[in-house]
């Protein structure tokens, strides 16, 4: 029978150390023992052992000893085919050995090897026989000698530590929180280590099991203590494993239950441990490494806020913005709600709003350039390299009133300056050509109308260098002339005035000068900067002087451009050719455009398959200020858009697709705003005219859409469902049928399939060749859709003189028509003392008991009001009607 309690002195004797030193360590472990006669319980021993393990960096103790066994059996069973099969079954049994109040049998774990002693060197643990032999006796003698040396060293160390203890008594009031100085100064002469306690357990010769390792539990310590006191220990009930059998690990359930280091809980965001216990590595003995070593390499969540640099494109969704800031989309939506915007996770934000949100959330907002493929264009742009620039030909636009001879002047210049044998050999629809003179080359642009010119200037493309303003000498300054002056002044373009029709006898050159001075165009001989040239497109008078003036103005401007570089320019016109596909007329502003180059204009890309000059001949390259017609684009380009030539077609495709996505986002954003406007405008009486517009060229289509959009008012709107270039096809008719739209064809016709569909469906299709006719027709249609003006017209005044109450009829008033007349279907107001008592209509109107349609002034009549009987003698009735008047735009 083992003792369950012993005194401190007995426990120190069993451990082979001085009682005073043991008292010191017990007090450091939080066990309140004052003298060597105090009893030590099993809980006190466990607390002392835990304290010693923690002080030496060992992992936490196991509170139980687990013994795992594996039993192998064989069973015979038939498989699916009926053949017998032998199946090997391995059964693992786990027994947990716990301490009892009066244990009769001490069970020991045999699953672990002994840990090396820290202070006393011990031989390699071996499985010894139950009979004590000579080798065991020699080992005991050696251990007794080493223990006596250890006791001597501990006695000297105790005196030194007690002296320091007295000096630090005030600072060491709380022993549990601050360990004793003896533990802080532990060195080669440390008092008692877990290894020394384990050393005692190795003195049991009768157990036949390996010594308990450094992490042995308190029950094992108790058994070793009893053995040192001379008690004859009993053999464990559990049979020790054979020598060749592998050691068993604790089961998963007991491991989770017994090892505190594995008891993990979900980590909150504020937990700085970073969940390091989840990723702790095991050593070669299957134990977790110490927390101190693991914490050196553990990841910890940053406590300081992380500031991101967010690149924001033109439009970005709420979810994408949250992803760039590494936050949840709900936080971004919350910030936007505080700013007064109700958004969803997929809603698009403009660049300015997104930057405000990023700054509000504490991050750095920057305009996106690194993830924009268009930044590649800035790298390859060498058009501004002044060192490589060479003089170029001027680009001249001829403007003026329609009837002032602008076309005749261009025809004369073209006819006389084109090489011999090619008279009239100019493709007129290109709208651009160049002529050669003795002093240089001049490129003319035939822009039919100021609308296209305004659109080009609005896009920021500097197409025109000089404007020739044509004014008829016999007509003077007209409204379109004034508009052309305003456009040239706004674009800061020099003007050369060509006073045409000087061959007529009624031409007045000075009057033209005076009228233009009133509009800000001052001639040079009057102190201004505009050159005035008198010309005649019929006789050729002054044509050479006009070209000289244009070239002189070009020299003053010092026009230069880079020739040996990728081409860059502007799309003048584009159309869809039935045989050649999308065709674009472009003006090269810098560089050299070659056949086979990859080109990019807006969201359209392609590779030049063919290139024609203004004479319709195929050419291989075009230099600066030369207009050419190119084929090979993916779709019809937008007139006025800038184009650039690239070496890599793949890069052109990437940029075009990026722009298409960007344009789509912007279009959807605008469409969403339009939908919100529609929601707020649903209660208003707004009529909408749906139109599908098809034209021969892109410029005409844009001009027609622009002109029709100007006809909109607050009451009538124009919705252009679709606009495009080319003939009217079946898909256009189907779209018009679905959207209830009117199809307008400008200089184009419907193909055979579309004509059959028009006949069967009855879709309204209108064809026009002149833009003003189309505008007038649409204006009339909009006028018919507008609500007419409603005006009130007073017909007469009636005085009520008698009141008659008739059963089944109601109140009938005998009246006298004072002025005007009273009609049966007219509206009336009942007036009493100048106040309106009732407004309504007549129920009946009689004269001499006969129904009449009207009663004129000076006659009597009887009448009754519909749904109103409160009529009194002396009241007056005002008779009126509503007159509707059609409105005109």
Swiss-Prot record:
A UniProt-annotated Pfam family: EF-G_D2
Signal peptide: none
Location of region: G5: 536-538
Ranges of Low complexity composition bias in the record: 209-228
G3, as annotated region: 446-449
Region (Disordered): 158-296
Any Gene Ontology CC annotation: cytosol
Region (G4): 500-503
GO molecular function: GTP binding; GTPase activity; translation initiation factor activity
Keywords recorded for this protein, A-Z: Cytoplasm, GTP-binding, Initiation factor, Nucleotide-binding, Protein biosynthesis
InterPro entries: DNA-bd_dom_put_sf, EF-G-like_DII, IF2_assoc_dom_bac, IF2_II, IF2_N, P-loop_NTPase, Small_GTP-bd, T_Tr_GTP-bd_dom
Positions of region (G1): 400-407
Gene3D superfamilies assigned to the protein according to its UniProt record, in alphabetical order: P-loop containing nucleotide triphosphate hydrolases, Putative DNA-binding domain, N-terminal subdomain of bacterial translation initiation factor IF2, Translation factors, Translation initiation factor IF- 2, domain 3
Compartments, as annotated in UniProt: Cytoplasm
Binding site for GTP: 400-407, 446-450, 500-503
Main location per the UniProt record: cytoplasm
Region feature (G2): 425-429
HAMAP family attached to this UniProt entry: IF_2_B
General function of this protein: One of the essential components for the initiation of protein synthesis. Protects formylmethionyl-tRNA from spontaneous hydrolysis and promotes its binding to the 30S ribosomal subunits. Also involved in the hydrolysis of GTP during the formation of the 70S ribosomal complex.
Alphabetized NCBIfam families for the sequence: IF-2, small_GTP
Family listed: Belongs to the TRAFAC class translation factor GTPase superfamily. Classic translation factor GTPase family. IF-2 subfamily.
PANTHER family: TR-TYPE G DOMAIN-CONTAINING PROTEIN, TRANSLATION INITIATION FACTOR IF-2-RELATED
UniProt name for this protein: Translation initiation factor IF-2
Organism: Nitrosomonas europaea (strain ATCC 19718 / CIP 103999 / KCTC 2705 / NBRC 14298)
Lineage summary: Bacteria, Pseudomonadati, Pseudomonadota, Betaproteobacteria, Nitrosomonadales
């Amino acid at each position: 029978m083992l003792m369950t309690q012993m005194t401190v002195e007995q426990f120190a004797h069993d451990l082979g150390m001085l009682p005073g030193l043991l008292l010191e360590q017990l007090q450091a472990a939080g066990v309140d023992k004052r003298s060597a006669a105090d009893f030590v319980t099993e809980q006190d021993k466990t607390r002392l052992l835990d304290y010693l393990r923690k002080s030496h960096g060992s992992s936490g103790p196991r509170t139980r000893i687990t013994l795992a066994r594996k039993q192998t059996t064989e069973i015979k069973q038939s498989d699916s085919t009926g053949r017998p099969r032998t199946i090997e079954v391995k059964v693992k049994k786990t027994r947990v050995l716990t301490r009892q109040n009066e244990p009769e049998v001490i069970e020991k774990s045999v699953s672990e090897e002994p840990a090396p002693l820290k202070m006393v060197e011990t031989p390699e643990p071996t499985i010894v026989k139950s009979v004590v032999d000579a080798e065991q006796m020699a080992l005991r003698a050696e251990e007794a000698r080493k223990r006596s040396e250890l006791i001597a060293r501990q006695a000297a160390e105790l005196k030194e530590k007690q002296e320091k203890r007295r000096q630090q008594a005030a600072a060491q009031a709380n022993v549990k929180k601050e360990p004793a100085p003896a533990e802080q100064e532990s060195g080669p002469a440390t008092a008692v280590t877990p290894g020394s306690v384990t050393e005692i357990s190795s003195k049991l010769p009768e157990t036949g099991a390996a010594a308990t390792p450094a992490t042995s539990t308190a029950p094992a310590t108790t058994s070793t203590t009893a053995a040192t006191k001379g008690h004859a220990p009993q053999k464990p009930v559990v049979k020790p494993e054979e020598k060749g059998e592998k050691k068993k690990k604790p089961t998963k359930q007991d491991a989770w239950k017994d090892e505190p280091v594995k008891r993990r809980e979900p980590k909150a965001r504020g937990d700085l441990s970073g969940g390091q216990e989840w990723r702790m590595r095991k050593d070669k003995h299957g134990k977790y490494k110490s927390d101190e070593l693991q914490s050196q390499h553990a990841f910890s969540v940053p406590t300081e806020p992380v500031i991101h640099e967010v690149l924001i494109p033109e439009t970005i969704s709420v979810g994408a913005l949250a992803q760039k800031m590494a936050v949840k989309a709900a936080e971004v939506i919350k910030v936007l709600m505080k700013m007064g915007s109700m958004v969803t996770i997929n809603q698009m934000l403009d660049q300015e709003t997104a930057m405000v949100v990023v700054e509000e959330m504490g991050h750095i907002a920057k305009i996106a350039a690194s993830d924009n493929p268009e930044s590649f264009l800035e790298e390859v742009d060498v058009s501004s390299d002044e060192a490589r620039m060479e003089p170029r030909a001027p680009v001249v636009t001829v403007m003026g009133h329609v009837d002032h001879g602008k076309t005749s002047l261009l025809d004369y210049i073209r006819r006389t300056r084109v090489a011999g044998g090619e008279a009239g050999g100019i493709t007129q629809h290109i709208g651009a050509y160049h002529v050669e003179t003795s002093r240089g080359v001049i490129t003319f642009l035939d822009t039919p109308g100021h609308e296209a010119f305004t659109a080009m200037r609005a896009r920021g493309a500097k197409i025109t260098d000089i404007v020739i303003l044509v004014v008829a000498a016999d007509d003077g300054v007209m409204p379109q002339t004034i508009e052309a002056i305003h456009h040239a002044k706004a674009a800061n373009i020099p003007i050369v005035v060509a006073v045409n029709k000087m061959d007529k006898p009624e031409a007045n050159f000075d009057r033209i000068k005076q009228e233009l001075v009133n509009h800000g165009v001052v001639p040079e001989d009057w102190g201004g900067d505009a050159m005035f040239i008198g010309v005649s497109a019929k006789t050729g008078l002054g044509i050479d002087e006009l070209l000289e003036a244009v070239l002189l103005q070009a020299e003053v401007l010092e026009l230069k451009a880079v020739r040996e570089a990728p081409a860059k320019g502007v799309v003048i016109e584009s159309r869809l050719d039935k045989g050649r596909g999308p065709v674009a007329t472009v003006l090269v502003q810098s560089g050299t455009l070659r056949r086979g180059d990859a080109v990019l204009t807006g969201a359209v890309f392609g590779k030049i398959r063919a290139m024609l000059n203004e004479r319709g001949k195929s050419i291989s390259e075009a230099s600066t200020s030369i207009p050419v017609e190119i084929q090979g684009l993916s779709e019809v380009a937008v007139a006025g858009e800038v184009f650039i030539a690239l070496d890599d077609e793949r890069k052109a495709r990437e940029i075009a697709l990026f722009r298409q996505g960007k344009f789509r986002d912007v279009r959807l954003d605008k469409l969403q705003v339009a939908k919100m406007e529609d929601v707020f405008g649903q209660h208003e009486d707004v009529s909408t005219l749906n139109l599908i517009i098809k034209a021969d060229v892109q410029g005409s289509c844009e001009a027609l859409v622009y002109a029709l959009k100007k006809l909109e008012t607050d009451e009538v709107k124009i919705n252009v469902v679709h606009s495009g270039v080319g003939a009217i096809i079946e898909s256009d008719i189907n779209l018009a049928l679905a959207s209830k739209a009117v199809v307008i064809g400008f200089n184009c016709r419907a193909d055979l399939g579309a004509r059959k569909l028009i006949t069967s469906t009855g879709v309204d299709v209108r064809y026009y060749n002149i833009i003003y006719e189309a505008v007038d027709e649409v204006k009339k249609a909009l006028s018919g859709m507008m609500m007419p003006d409603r005006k009130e017209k007073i017909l007469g005044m009636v005085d009520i003189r008698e009141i008659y109450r008739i059963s089944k009829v109601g109140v009938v008033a005998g009246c006298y028509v004072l002025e005007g007349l009273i009609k049966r279907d007219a509206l009336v107001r009942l007036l009493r003392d100048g106040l309106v008592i009732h407004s309504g209509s007549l129920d009946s109107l009689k004269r001499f008991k006969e129904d009449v349609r009207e009663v004129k002034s000076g006659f009597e009549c009887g009448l009754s009001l519909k749904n109103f009987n409160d009529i009194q003698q002396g009241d007056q009735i005002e008779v009126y009607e509503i007159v509707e008047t059609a409105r005109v735009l």
